[in-house]
Every structure is written in structure tokens, then in C-alpha cells.
């Protein structure tokens, strides 16, 4: 049951699409506070949610902010990252969920100030509060997802491997990447183009020196099974003669200063204007610009810098230079030196800059900081709504850096500029179920780490987690060690682990689609799948992938194994990646086990009475198109038989809900496998 309480005059974020709610006079569970509300926590209560954020799956013990921020240092002392996900579940003495529909800053003090008190502070008393009651956390998630709408569904090729770097500078560098993948028997479906493919960092342009025949090049890549995925940034370069800039100024499509003139900020191109993504006309105009690249054969995009990131504003830059001049003749002591040192560092993402510009919305003129968290959401919405008009029957890949609940209907996310740190492998695992709760099923980290220099063992172990993420993307920053998998010594292991991803695709795609179509979770904490298991409630480094699969990755350097907790008897599957994905199976009882896992191995576990369908192998897997989704091997520990509902479609069109896409597979106690569709062939592994 969902209840709603309105405070003040909320801005309509359009995050909520469901209407099956009941108004409430007084809010249950929560105690009203002058600037929000609080909840007295029991010692055993667990707090789930908040999407992409730092720390663990259980958010208890820290303070978090919903404040979209361009911050590449994802350390434990931070309180916010790129997105705003105001959905949380309390699980314990009482189990309920709540969602705060508000586009500005919200603070979640999850027992930081007072160990036993959850205190939520909303910047203004203009918001909608939803309380969700259910039989379990999974039921609460299901109801919430019905409230906010169906999750984005990408094309099937978007579940293949993606290679990215800031930047592949020209056509030949991209060709070299693809050739090296193919030579080393590593499957690949997409290559990402970062900001240097553009003409001087201008959106919806192509540098004709570096990519002189862009449409032909996109066709050349597609003929090899490779899609190009170019970046689009939020800032539009100020330059006479640049059509996007001139149209935006002429029609009043940019965010403005208080006096109505276009607001100027600094990002990659230097001085830019921000399209007013909250103005419906401006949003439609910006979305229409994606046609420039669609017409050249592009079928996927990533939106970046859309918090929006601000390197500087003209006003803050002017004040900074004045302050530097003031310090020029001073004796810089312990106080003034550090103040001087931080002057330039404080330029970027300065909170004051977000109070300088305005939006023209359906509800009138709004200062940006009051609606800050829905800017990136509406940039991706601009693209999604345009795709519906420009390619109504075709799935287009879209993922974004900044996000807010509601954006999950239009695209996925990658989890931003992480580092090549072992702790970030675990952090990426923690983010998966938290994002799934909020509707963001299509997600993934920068495998290998974006910042810092990576190591071969780190990349291998990260792939051991990443092959289970819907978005499988290796990405790194300029100036760091190149980390394409073919650059390392153990090429056979990298080839095998990527091949394993493609063998698992029938299951991964099936579980993703069922979760999206039925408002469920593709990835969930163990506690959601085993609600009566007290120990499972405490496990933070294992998760369920779909209904059948438990993963427990190795995330510490030099570890050659780890302890794993199995809530029930399961089938262990050990994959020897450097030996053409040779698989060994062992039945393990419930309980704690030390599991050896060598660098070239991946180990996962199949639930008793469940089926894991995988594709048949071979040397021909180069991309998603070469995976046979209709010729399956079934892994199972099913002494009493088992059944599985398998989803398969063409992966391109949008007729998701047709009954014929759902195939029923059974396995009897003697190992005899059947499917109710003649086109899907199955056999026990």
C-alpha cells in the first residue's frame, strides 16, 4: 500500500507516474520535525537504498546528501556523488519504504549524529512524501517501481562488452582497438568515443580531421559488429557561427542569469551556456539535435557532465582573481597560505554558482539550486523523448552520469569517475542492488578504474564482478596506464572471462528483461532473497543476480580465494577462464566455506532447484549477434527437478510484452530437459 503526504507547494518533478496512492493525514512510522522527519531505529534495523552512493549496502552509520555533484574522488568521507535517489527502505522491527519527491537537496543522517536515529532534512517544505508498506523489502521495491514507472530497456547489443578511453583520438585508433580484440579472441560490441571526437568540444559536431568520413566509419564498424557510442555534454560552447549556440540564444533556450541574460559557465570548451532542460520547448529542441548523429548511423550515446558540472562561473572566476591579487603582497602565514592554495580548487562545483542561474519551467521561473537534482534527468529525458519521435520502433542505447529517480525510464547510468582502487571493486558491488531498488537496472562501473594507474590483477578481478553488470564497460582517463584487456600478459584469461560473459548472456538478458517488465530487481542483497536468514542480512560482499545466481567476487589484492556464506545448499560452478572456460561443478552445503579462486578463475553459485541457462560455447563468439540465445545448456542442482521462465526477443524492437517471448523450460529429476518452444533447444550441462 502506498500513502502520500504533500507539504507546501511541491515542484512537479514528473518522477511519479502511478496514481494508485492514498492520501494520509498523519504519517506512520516517522516523527515530524521542523525541517523534515526522523525515525527511532532498533539496533537490528537495516537501511537500504539511496542508489549510487559511497559505503555499504546497509546505509546505516553515515550522513548522505541528495545533491548531484561532479566529484571523481569516491572516498568514504564523501556524502554525495553524481545522482539523487531519495528512496529508502527500513527493514527490521518495522519494514516500510519512503520516497521524497523533491528536486533540491535532501540530507539523510542515518545514525551519524545520533547512532539510533534516522533523520531526514529537506531543504524546503515543498515536497511529496510517499510511505510504502509491503510484505517484504522486495514487495516494497515492486510497489515503488510501479509508482515511478518501467525501467529503461536497452538494445541487446548493449549487454556486450564495451571498450572506452578518454580518448580514442581518430578512426585508426578505434580500428586498432577492434583489431586487437578480434586478434586475441576477445568479444566486443561497442567502442566509446569521448570528448575528442567533437570539433573543439562542441556538442553535435564531429572533428573532420580526426573522423573525416564519420557515417562511413560508423557503417564500417557496424559491419564488424561494433557500435560507436559518442559522448554528449551538458554545456553548449559560446561561439558565433555554431548553429546549436545561435539557435539556443535566438529562441531563449538557455538557462539565464537573474536579469534574463544567458548564464555563462566554464566546462571543457571554455565558456558555455546550459540548455534549460526544465523548459519543455528547450528540452525538445536539445533532444532533436541527437538526430545529427542518428542520421550517421549512431545507435547509442552517453550523456556526461550533466549534474551540471561547473569548472567556474564568470562571477566566481572574477572574485578568485581579485582575491589572488589581494594575496600577492601579503606574508602568507599558516592561515592565509592554505586559503590562497584552495582558491582555485574551490572554483569547481562551487555551491554559490548553482544559485546564480534560473530555469523557465511549466511552474514558472525557478532558481537552479532549488531544482538542481533533476537537470541531468531531464537532459537524458530530452534524448529519450526525441528517440521516441525519431526512432519510434527501435531501441537506442543511452546512459548518463547524473541521474535522479524518473530518469530510469529514459536511460541507464555508469557510476562515474571511479579510481583503480581495490576498494572500488567492492563499492561497485554495493551500488548494484541499491541502484536496482531505485529502478536503475542498466548500470555498471568503469571496469579497471577510471582514475589512477591500474594493475593486471585488479582488472581481472574487476571483470569477475563486471561480467554480471548489465553495462560491461572498461574505461580509463587520459594520462593513466592503458587498460584494454589485450595489453596485459595473461591474454587467455581476459579472453576467457569476456567469453564467459557472452556464454552467460541468455541468462543475464532474460533476468534483466523480466526485472524491467515486472518492476523487479535484476540484482538484490542476499537478505532480500533469504529474508529469514539472520546471517544473510549481514552479508555485504555477496549479491544475487536474478533468481538463480549468487556471486561472491574476490576484491582484495593478492587474495587467492575468500570465505563465502551460502544460505542454502548450492551448486558451485568454477570457470577456468584461461582454459577455454572449462567448467567444474560441485554441490556445497549451506554454511561458510573458504573458496579458492585463482586469478584466471570465476566462481559462482546456482541455487538448489533453480536453473542457469547459458549459451553453447565455441570459438565464434565475437559479439552479441554471434551468441545463440536459442541453443542452451542448463546448469542446475535439481534433485527434485526445476523450472525456469526464459525470456528471449529480437533485442532491437519494442514489442517487449508479447507472450511468445516467454519460454518455459523444465528439468526433471533424471536430468531430462524440455522447453515449450520448438525454437529454443535445451540440454543439461
Residue spans of the language-model regions?
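Short, hydrophobic/amphipathic alpha-helical packing segments
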Residues: 64-68, 81-84, 175, 283, ...
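Glycine-rich, histidine-containing beta strand-loop boundary motifs that form or position
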Residues: 41, 50, 91, 99-102, ...
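Short acidic-glycine loop/turn motifs at beta-strand connectors
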Residues: 89-94, 257-259, 567-568, 669
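Catalytic and substrate-binding clefts that recognize carbohydrates or anionic sugar/phosphate headgroups
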Residues: 1-155, 165-166, 171, 178-183, ...
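Aromatic- and carboxylate-enriched substrate-binding clefts and catalytic-loop regions
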Residues: 187-494, 529-530
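N-terminal small/glycine-rich loop or linker at the start of catalytic domains
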Residues: 150-164, 261-274
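Extracellular structured ligand-interaction cores
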Residues: 82-86, 93-95, 103, 126, ...
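Catalytic core of carbohydrate-active enzymes
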Residues: 75, 374-375, 380-389, 393-396, ...
